Amino acid sequence: MGNRELVSMPTFRIPGVVTDTENWRFSIDGLVETPMKLNMQNLTSLPSVRVRDDFTCLEGWTVKGITWKGVRVSELLTLVSVKPTAKYAVFVAPEDYTQGLSIQRCMEPTTILAYELNDTPLRAEHGAPLRLVSRGQECFESVKWVHKMHLTDEHVEGSARNIALDRIASP
């Protein structure tokens, strides 16, 4: 099945997400020397990068040339001093939506936690305050509303793929 080209990102059901980022925190824990909780000001004060990519979904659509801006996950891993036994990061969002990535993939320069989409602040329907983005990823790996990164030595597939496939299969 070919992909339909869309001009903008579609939106789906939005769970009870954070709209007030003043008290919101992103936590990093697990196999790290220095667990951290960062607010949006902390995150946006870190060096930022832009990642431009086509966004393709299993549902059969593509949005060409999307530009994300955010902080590299590798930058955050450096801040917390990852323990040598850590092999995977699990990104956590509301409603038990999780996605695991290898530390190797997290260290890629195009794996970021985005807070802007196409030069505008990320809106809630697109994953604000933070969305996991990695060039070439499957659409379900682009986890919206990320509030935690947990480092572990065990592979964690996460729930993202199954939730996405269930949504596609539902009429």
Task: Enumerate the language-model features and the residues they cover.
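A glycine-rich, hydrophobic loop/mini-helix early in the fold
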Residues: P15-W68
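Short acidic (Asp/Glu) patches
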Residues: N39-Q41, S74-E75, A114-E116
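Extended, aromatic/histidine-rich regions of cofactor-dependent oxidoreductases associated
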Residues: M1-F26, V32, L79-P171
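Mid-length scaffold segments of soluble, non-membrane domains
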Residues: R50-L101
